[in-house]
Amino acid sequence: MKVIIATDGSSFSLAAAQEACRLFGRMKETEFTIVAVFEDVPIAATEPFALPPEYYQEMTDAARNQAQHNADQTAEALGSGCPDANVAIEVLSGKPASQIVDLAERIGAQTIVVGSHGRGFWGRLLGSVSNSVVNHAPCSVLVVRSEPAGEE
């Protein structure tokens, strides 16, 4: 079974990884893919407000590094509960929901596991990554609701 765990580095994502471990970790054939997606910093080219190109590259590099850190942290959390898990990491650039869905199609995932921030009415109105993944995924999606300490 191929399971994608999407992470943004939040405690909600870590809770999703723990739930994925609990549900799928005992199956020897489970292949976990942890995905973290970062968005490139858009270039503002209007003078006199334009910044040097190096600034945008530095910001994109910082976003990529943070996404890698988030994925590594999630892999560590998954490994603590499922020490024998087969885990791969993908760090992708683009819109998070579409990259997660594209990855699921590309690897033939059977399940995507995402955390939910539970933003209530306004969050639902404005949309969210988990909502978009649920509506566009080619496979089952498990949305893990939790209220970790210190976050609401």
Language model: regions and residue ranges:
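Intrinsically disordered or low-complexity boundary/linker segments at protein termini
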Residues: 1-18, 135-152
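Small/aliphatic-rich secondary-structure junction motif
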Residues: 2-55
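Structural beta-alpha unit
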Residues: 22, 76-112, 148-152
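General small-molecule cofactor/ligand-binding pocket signal
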Residues: 33-35, 88-92, 142
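Short secondary-structure boundary segments
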Residues: 36, 115-117, 145-146
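A short acidic, glycine-rich active-site loop
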Residues: 53-69
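Glycine-rich, Arg-bearing micro-motifs that act as flexible, cationic patches
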Residues: 111-132, 150-152
